[in-house]
Amino acid sequence: MTRLSSSFFFTLREAPAEAVAVSHKLLLRAGFIRPLAGTAGLYAYGPLMQRVLQKVGRIVREEMDATGAQEALFCQLQPAEIWKESGRWTVYTQDGTMFTLKDGQGEQAREYGLGPTHEEAVCDFVRASLNSYKQLPFHLYQVQTKFRNEKRPRFGLMRGREFIMKDGYSFHATPESLDETYRAMYRAYTNMFRRCGLDFRAVEADSGAIGGSGSHEFMALCDIGEDTILYCDAAGYAANVEKAVSLVSDPEAIGPGSYAVKSTPGIRTVEQQAAMLGVPISRIVKNIVYVALYAEADPRPVLVSIRGDRHINETKLKNRLDCLDVRLADEAELAAWVEVKPGFVGPDAPIAGVIRLADRSVDGLTDFSTGCNQDDVQCVWANWGENGLVLPEVADLDTAQAGDHCHLAPEATLQSARGVELGHIFKLGTKYSRPMQVLFADEAGELQPALMGCYGVGVSRLPAAVVEQSHDNDGILWPIAIAPYQVVLVPANVAVEAQRQAAEELYRSLTAAGIDTLLDDRPERAGVKFKDADLIGIPLRVTLGRDLEAGLVEIKVRGGGAAEKVPLAEALAQIKGLIERLNSAQHSR
């Protein structure tokens, strides 16, 4: 019998000052989590949180197992050699993402990393036993603690340095097989998040450091989300802003004129340029110099031309260049390369070894103003193909934004929302299997690298996202499927023997029926117990008080309005019905 009087249970009147997110505040106040030695990004899970995580984990495992995936468990401590094979050791150690250590000192010491992800470990496991196409496809997953050296851990469980994740890896002989598993995982993730009571969207996404081709994120919609989602209901389109595509509006009209070079001293922005020249910002071509950073090659200068009223999407630029990262060139680099200040660089700037790119917004643009590679000078009424201006290679490098027209439904405009990433699915292709030699013999007997998929869920982040969406002024509103307990029994006065005995008998009936039940038998005032029950968010509260003399108990749905008095003899049936109703409402979201 789970008695609160003999449980390690604690609540706080106020959340610590450093807690900003609602989920962080409530999970701290309700005793679900505690920071370890005051360290940002490290949290211990209390008994209540562990129950929530177990239920989330069960849902995740049920949906994964239903697709035919097999659960395994891989090493958290991973030798540097396998990460060097894939080419990611430099990436993850240079930016400090991975926690690293050595097993000794001197030249013989071996380097290791605490796994932020497990592509390399899984590839090493599989390549030792994969021989034939007849063994494919298969899908391995784990629910495992991960480590990531977040530079700015914040919002409690939303962004931590140690967290629980479900990560799965599938292996295939053909693209069609990979596509089939990808679709199955899309459905499984949709089921998972619906069962957990979340309001979410699946959006097209960038693959980031994981790499690969196709990619979708599953985003919980909430105000503290660090990601921006752009969507169009008319087209059923949704994408992370890093990936989103839109139709750029036509440039403003401009009067007739002819090519000329004009003095524009002291300007620093396109707004100043437009005002001084008397032209619309949408008729300006700005030329921005970046530096592309590569793992195995020297940095390269990159010159990007884009319309004055648009902004470069650096994720798209990095993907187009297939480089580790991009950064803006500083004034010293500009001075060395082209001897001109920012704002006056032209699309034809004579930079040695430069990669020239143009965003789609300037393709076809006419009568524009742009830099002339000379300080304090701009050219006006310029056109591609005239006066030595050659349109660079065109690519989608624009940052889509709310209000842009949808590329799939041009009559509709994109809307935006904030989201927290809970899941991410990728088509990796041979990004890891080729360098790590995860090979199989095809039907002709020739060795081929296996095609891979990768599928992650933030198991410990998920409850925090639920709390962000499901709470009120009194505390948490857990969905019935993942609540730490489904029912809390509250004898109003445990000193009254009849109340205590009735509560214990009802507890036994409920647990025999498979209902997770907590008995709050603390010698506290009923009001204190009610406040704690609301704070920790148990969906159903049953009070056994003075009405018990008339054979009645009080049942209240958390956040569901007034309590209802029912005969004690009917309480079990009533509670079963309420749980069924709450489950049905959750599944229909």
Swiss-Prot record:
Subcellular location: Cytoplasm
Biological process (GO), any one: prolyl-tRNA aminoacylation
Known EC number: 6.1.1.15
EC main group: ligase
Cross-referenced Gene3D superfamilies: Anticodon-binding domain, Bira Bifunctional Protein, Domain 2, YbaK/aminoacyl-tRNA synthetase-associated domain
InterPro entries: aa-tRNA-synt_IIb (IPR002314), aa-tRNA-synth_II (IPR006195), aa-tRNA-synth_II/BPL/LPL (IPR045864), Anticodon-bd (IPR004154), Anticodon-bd_dom_sf (IPR036621), Pro-tRNA-ligase_IIa (IPR002316), Pro-tRNA-synth_IIa_bac-type (IPR004500), Pro-tRNA-Synthase_IIa_type1 (IPR023717)
Keywords: Aminoacyl-tRNA synthetase, ATP-binding, Cytoplasm, Ligase, Nucleotide-binding, Protein biosynthesis
Keyword flag Metal-binding: no
Reactions listed under catalytic activity: tRNA(Pro) + L-proline + ATP = L-prolyl-tRNA(Pro) + AMP + diphosphate
Matches recorded under CDD domains: ProRS-INS, ProRS_anticodon_short, ProRS_core_prok
GO cellular component: cytosol
Top-level taxon: Bacteria
MF term (GO), any: aminoacyl-tRNA deacylase activity
Subunit structure: Homodimer.
Domain note: Consists of three domains: the N-terminal catalytic domain, the editing domain and the C-terminal anticodon-binding domain.
Similarity comment: Belongs to the class-II aminoacyl-tRNA synthetase family. ProS type 1 subfamily.
Name this polypeptide is given: Proline--tRNA ligase
Organism encoding this protein: Gloeobacter violaceus (strain ATCC 29082 / PCC 7421)
Gene: proS
